[in-house]
Amino acid sequence: MSLLEINDVNMNYHTKNGATEAIKHLSFNIEEGEFLSIIGPSGCGKSTLLNIISGLLEPSSGKVIYNDPEVKNNLDKMGYMFQKDYLFPWLTVRENVLLGLKIKNILTEENIKNADKLLKSYDLEKFKDHKPTQLSGGMRQRVALIRTLALNPRILLLDEPFSALDYQTRQKVTDDVYEIIKREGKTAIMVTHDLGEAIIMSKRVIVLTKRPATIKDDVEIVFANKDATPFKKRQEPEFNKYFGELWKEIDGVNG
């Protein structure tokens, strides 16, 4: 059974000028432990879809079915990672990581120990008393991810998480984030405009059409070298094959 089912979801916005269809008859499943990327033209409704999955938006019709009771009964089991890290500059790294636990009133001894363990596991312990302004952009994104993981989500929603980083930093951070999500055994859904990023991070890539968004293609991503990091996947022969395939799909959508 799939962890999550998107079942014939439609989203309409109503303004004084009339109704606008944002999403139309969207259906797909997400398996436990899967990393799924969603790509498509700007403004096609990718972020809207993430907000529907997270429960922040109610679809006009259709259903999001959470087959895990832990998620169904507690949508806090979904964690968000945004384009910006949203770290508070006056708090230390550790205080930023613990902030979500504090806000949700679950700052227990066990959860604090888990947060400290995450900081240590991902080489941030020695920076725990630093302020965010003392860190590189890549390290700040790692802190933002650890802050999300400290809440122990079952599903991670990533909305253009690397777009604010320069190219070189981006390559390093994609490796870091991929490894962390893999080691923690999380299910992840990422929205991105970067085809290469989608290929190297994902097991599947869904291509959306222009608004109203429907599914144009659902591509399984398989690399022969299963141990390749995202950075190394760019050098594998399958990368160019998938890039060409997805480029044609996107080019067809934009054409």
What are these regions (language model features)?
Residues G62-N74:
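Conserved ABC transporter NBD signature motif
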Residues L156-D159:
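Catalytic Walker B motif of ABC-type/P-loop ATPase nucleotide-binding domains
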Residues H130-T133, L151:
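Conserved signature/switch motifs of ABC ATPase nucleotide-binding domains
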Residues S54:
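Helix-to-loop junction immediately C-terminal to a conserved catalytic motif
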Residues I39-P41:
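The feature captures the beta-strand-to-loop junction immediately N-terminal to the Walker
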Residues L91-L98:
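Short coil-to-helix segment of the ABC ATPase nucleotide-binding domain corresponding to the Q-loop/switch region
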